[in-house]
């Protein structure tokens, strides 16, 4: 009798072990595929941010408009995110994520298409479309008592030039492609995280989330590396003779091969979509597999019938689902803790998004570093630190079994530390640029009070210069001049790089003693002290990003814990929608609009309209860029304090009682009942179906 009982137990244990193995393997396969999609998602995001400067210059648009283009990703996401979050959890989640990745890839390819339909990039008004004529002969020098119209085209030519002008409406294709990329990215986070939270073992979802976010940082590393590489390549590489291009990557008019970034990221997104189409809807064992035990076979048959009935009911009860959606939506909006947390994260994330969107422009204007160098430093150095912070944040929550209030305190602490390091940026600013007629007078002694009209000096008043031109030259006195003509230069040497100008009369008025009144093409570089400050900036950026990442996992965990278990997916989706709508869309726009106010020299295209900004007042730029971001962060900290106080009143007693009973609140917020009122064990109660 004992032997028969032992055989029966063994027979029952074997299918149980097989089920557990298949279940865990299914979840691990999903995690692997989701990791690939996270890499594709973050790669696309970094590619867009690192290409902002080049898109702005290539299409001759303002920072506020390029911020709007950047926000089109969030617009696309916003269009479908709530419905994907709610109804997507009832459908085949892996396949929906796969479709999203494919659409995201198509959007990336579409973003790059305008490059193939536009003419050659014209970095100067004097630069002809024929690349072979980009030589010093097209540079205007001081032509005393000669007519300026010699350099101007006829109205007919100007009209034709407007049709292919860089600042035309071709940027709309970039807008549409980025929006399509946002639509495709929508299912990845809410459906992926809810899938993990539903099927992971108790307490493991935070660890998995930390691992996912850490792996996702591979995308930014690749993105920054590609951004650095392609930023050094001229935009029309393969189409023009590069030896005739007289500007360098340090020039404010330089445009890199931004379109190659989007081709690479788009193709990678398409590839990442493939594994999801081969994954099951849930990590269950195949229904056709038979159980050894008769009782287990009966249970399995009942489960299959229940699943079939549920699928049938879902198809017939669309109206009921819509009603349930609005009831669920009302439930999360009447949750004061959830609403407060959404508001504070909106302020916090708006600061991050706005600052990161224009960080490359900030580095270029403040420290004189090209975007290619900023890309590689931010990618190679800071991103591994950021990934470590994400992983460590999830590990700390799991290791110390932080309750809801504990997670909120931990998140607030990381925000305080991040702000503390961010404020240090105010102490490592460089002096304002020295640009004659824009930031200082031509004698180099006094700052210019207004830059609405370029003030001329007696040293160039007879040169008949085009004041709208931007062809900067650096005098050997360390001052940048808007053009060789406005520097009073009479002659030049060299048809390619480097080009040197001589007999520059405006250098003489600065009191230069060596009587070598020459200038070379390009803006004057920053001094060594400013370069050292740039490396301090990178070091502080590492610490700032580490603490920002350390609290990243806690954001998701707080959302999961302060709403009902069945509303997790909707709460995550609505939170993401608000962040994207008011943070992702608006933050780049108002950051860009304020940055535009610090511009001191705008380009003018052939249509006579304003193009992109050529140079900024770096001091005003820093005040706007750092000040706005700091104010948003401080405001979020005030809400953090209020949130923690409210959480203590609501959760502290409950957490103490749970601790006394020897239990820990899991991500499903304790055990629940299924639709038929049968008891359904939590993640920790059934080790066979959770990993």
UniProtKB/Swiss-Prot annotation:
List the PROSITE patterns.
KAZAL_2, MFS
Could you say what the effect of mutating residue 155 to T is?
A: Decreased transport activity
Q: Which reaction does it catalyse?
A: taurocholate(out) = taurocholate(in); dehydroepiandrosterone 3-sulfate(out) = dehydroepiandrosterone 3-sulfate(in); estrone 3-sulfate(out) = estrone 3-sulfate(in); 3,3',5'-triiodo-L-thyronine(out) = 3,3',5'-triiodo-L-thyronine(in)
Task: Give the subcellular location.
Answer: Basolateral cell membrane; Basal cell membrane
Can you cite a GO biological process for this protein? sodium-independent organic anion transport
Keyword tRNA-binding part of the UniProt annotation? no
Task: Specify the effect of residue 156 to G.
Answer: Decreased transport activity
Q: How does activity depend on pH?
A: Optimum pH is 6.5 with prostaglandin E2 and L-thyroxine (T4) as substrates.
Q: Where is the Kazal-like domain?
A: 453-508
| Gene Ontology annotations for the cellular component aspect, listed alphabetically | basal plasma membrane; basolateral plasma membrane; membrane; plasma membrane
Q: Where are the transmembrane segments?
A: 29-48, 68-88, 95-119, 169-197, 217-237, 256-280, 332-353, 374-397, 402-425, 538-560, 570-595, 630-647
Residue spans, topological domain Extracellular: 49-67, 120-168, 238-255, 354-373, 426-537, 596-629
Q: Name one GO molecular function term.
A: thyroid hormone transmembrane transporter activity
**What are the Phosphoserine sites (modified residues) in this protein?**
293, 295, 672, 682
Q: Does the keyword Phosphoprotein apply?
A: yes
Entry-linked InterPro entries: Kazal_dom, Kazal_dom_sf, MFS_dom, MFS_trans_sf, OATP
Which of this chain's residues carry glycans? 130, 134, 432, 503, 516, 617
Against PANTHER family, the record matches this protein to:
ORGANIC ANION TRANSPORTER (PTHR11388), SOLUTE CARRIER ORGANIC ANION TRANSPORTER FAMILY MEMBER 1B1 (PTHR11388:SF82)
Q: What does this protein do?
A: Mediates the Na(+)-independent uptake of organic anions. Shows broad substrate specificity, can transport both organic anions such as bile acid taurocholate (cholyltaurine) and conjugated steroids (dehydroepiandrosterone 3-sulfate, 17-beta-glucuronosyl estradiol, and estrone 3-sulfate), as well as eicosanoids (prostaglandin E2, thromboxane B2, leukotriene C4, and leukotriene E4), and thyroid hormones (T4/L-thyroxine, and T3/3,3',5'-triiodo-L-thyronine). Can take up bilirubin glucuronides from plasma into the liver, contributing to the detoxification-enhancing liver-blood shuttling loop.
Name of the featured protein: Solute carrier organic anion transporter family member 1B1
Q: Which organism is it from?
A: Homo sapiens (Human)
